Swiss-Prot record:
This is Prokaryotic ubiquitin-like protein Pup. Protein modifier that is covalently attached to lysine residues of substrate proteins, thereby targeting them for proteasomal degradation. The tagging system is termed pupylation. Belongs to the prokaryotic ubiquitin-like protein family. Residues 1-29 are annotated as: Disordered. Pfam families: Pup. Pathway: Protein degradation; proteasomal Pup-dependent pathway.
Amino acid sequence: MSQQSLNAPGPGAEDGNDPEAVTGGQTFASAQAADDLLDEIDSVLESNAETFVRSFVQKGGQ
């Protein structure tokens, strides 16, 4: 998802003077945190994918 679509004003935000309007800054921060987490997972997978996968697989394949 692009930053433009995350921070685009919603319907009814024509004049920008609505005191209850949400700016989308928190949404961008959440998206950035998710991107950082995915980058960390990618780096772990690149270095040791087998151990990463085994940590999620229980005995018996469950």
